Amino acid sequence: WNETSDKDLYTDSR
């Protein structure tokens, strides 16, 4: 998966 996208989503989720 895209680490950048995943990280962004993860941050947004939190």
From Swiss-Prot:
Cofactor(s) the record lists: Ca(2+); heme b
Reactions the enzyme catalyzes: 2 a phenolic donor + H2O2 = 2 a phenolic radical donor + 2 H2O
Coiled coil spans: none
GO biological process per UniProt: hydrogen peroxide catabolic process
GO terms of molecular function: lactoperoxidase activity; metal ion binding
Enzyme type, top EC level: oxidoreductase
EC numbers for this chain: 1.11.1.7
Cofactor remark from the record: Binds 2 calcium ions per subunit. Binds 1 heme b (iron(II)-protoporphyrin IX) group per subunit.
Keywords: Calcium, Heme, Hydrogen peroxide, Iron, Metal-binding, Oxidoreductase, Peroxidase
Physiological role: Removal of H(2)O(2), oxidation of toxic reductants, biosynthesis and degradation of lignin, suberization, auxin catabolism, response to environmental stresses such as wounding, pathogen attack and oxidative stress. These functions might be dependent on each isozyme/isoform in each plant tissue.
Protein family (similarity comment): Belongs to the peroxidase family. Classical plant (class III) peroxidase subfamily.
Record-given protein name: Peroxidase 1
Lineage: Eukaryota, Viridiplantae, Streptophyta, Embryophyta, Tracheophyta
